[in-house]
């Protein structure tokens, strides 16, 4: 008992019992590279009961996440200050135009994507079991119990055959012009852009974002889509034609239930 009293007195004198709990700062949501390029999809809200039933939110033209960047002033050199008037990062050739290297510069991307995947699997399995026993014989005669003897003959066969195949192909070609939204420390350019086309019963759009090397841009200020790193290409549409290509709410509900 004396030890407990002494320990309590010691803690009260040292002030350990009056220490306030350390407050841990709340976790801050950082902006990822994907959010910076494509926008935060978690912040998108449904436009009504139609989008709720369709289980999707259609993109809109003029989305701030895809808005162009218009610099208010000329960007400074992205190379470290060395005191020299010569900058190796801005060397131009006598036979081509100056290449985009700053925020807001425009680059044309030639879309030429062809992908194809084929998969096929076959499975055949079989198993058979046989078991038998001759009648018991005692003294040269079969041992019987009424009409039955002690013999049996069992056989079992299990077979399974499965065949699965999948074939998928995608192709897109065309052009889209994008803008530089960021210049990385190594000189690579982060680009982003979209194109909207209004049709009779809806809109079609193409969106592209990714990272490119200035050296891959040709003399026509064009770069192939297969030269874009971390490329995200979207080609879809909105409106009646888009809705007709998807099953309705009840069809999706019963398919999930089954």
From Swiss-Prot:
Lipidated positions per record (N-palmitoyl cysteine): 16
Gene Ontology molecular function terms on file: cytoskeletal motor activity
Domain of life: Bacteria
One term under GO cellular component: bacterial-type flagellum basal body, distal rod, L ring
Predominant localisation class: membrane
Residues covalently joined to lipid (S-diacylglycerol cysteine): 16
Compartment(s) where it occurs, according to its Swiss-Prot or TrEMBL record: Cell outer membrane; Bacterial flagellum basal body
PROSITE patterns assigned: PROKAR_LIPOPROTEIN (PS51257)
GO terms, biological process: bacterial-type flagellum-dependent cell motility
Keyword list, A-Z: Bacterial flagellum, Cell outer membrane, Lipoprotein, Membrane, Palmitate, Signal
Segments crossing the lipid bilayer: none
Signal peptide region: 1-15
Alphabetical list of InterPro entries matching this protein: Flag_Lring
PANTHER family listed in its UniProt record: FLAGELLAR L-RING PROTEIN
Family annotation (NCBIfam families): PRK00249.1-2
HAMAP family per UniProt: FlgH
Stated family: Belongs to the FlgH family.
Protein known as: Flagellar L-ring protein
Organism, scientific name: Vibrio atlanticus (strain LGP32) (Vibrio splendidus (strain Mel32))
Gene (name only): flgH
């Amino acid at each position: 008992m004396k030890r407990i009293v002494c320990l309590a007195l010691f803690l009260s004198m040292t002030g350990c019992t009056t220490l306030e709990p350390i407050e841990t700062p709340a976790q801050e949501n950082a902006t990822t590279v994907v959010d910076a390029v494509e926008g935060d999809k978690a912040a998108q809200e449904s436009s009504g009961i139609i989008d709720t039933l369709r289980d999707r939110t259609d993109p809109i033209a003029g989305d701030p996440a895809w808005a162009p960047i218009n610099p208010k002033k000329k960007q400074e050199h992205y190379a470290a200050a060395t005191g020299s008037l010569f900058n190796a990062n801005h060397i131009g050739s006598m036979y081509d135009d100056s290449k985009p290297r700053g925020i807001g510069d425009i680059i044309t991307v030639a879309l030429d994507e062809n992908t194809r995947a084929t998969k096929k699997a076959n499975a055949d399995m079989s198993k058979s079991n046989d078991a038998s026993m001759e009648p018991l014989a005692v003294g040269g005669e079969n041992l019987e119990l009424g009409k039955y003897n002690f013999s049996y003959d069992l056989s079992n066969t299990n077979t399974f055959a499965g065949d699965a195949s999948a074939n998928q192909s995608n192709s897109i070609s065309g052009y889209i012009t994008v803008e530089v939204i960021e210049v990385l420390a190594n000189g690579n350019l982060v680009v982003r852009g979209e194109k909207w086309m209004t049709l009779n019963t809806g809109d079609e759009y193409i969106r592209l974002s990714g990272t490119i090397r200035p050296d891959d841009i040709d003399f026509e200020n064009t770069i192939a889509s297969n030269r874009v790193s971390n490329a995200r290409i979207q080609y879809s549409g909105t409106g009646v034609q888009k809705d007709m290509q998807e099953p309705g709410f009840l069809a999706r509900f019963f398919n999930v239930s089954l």
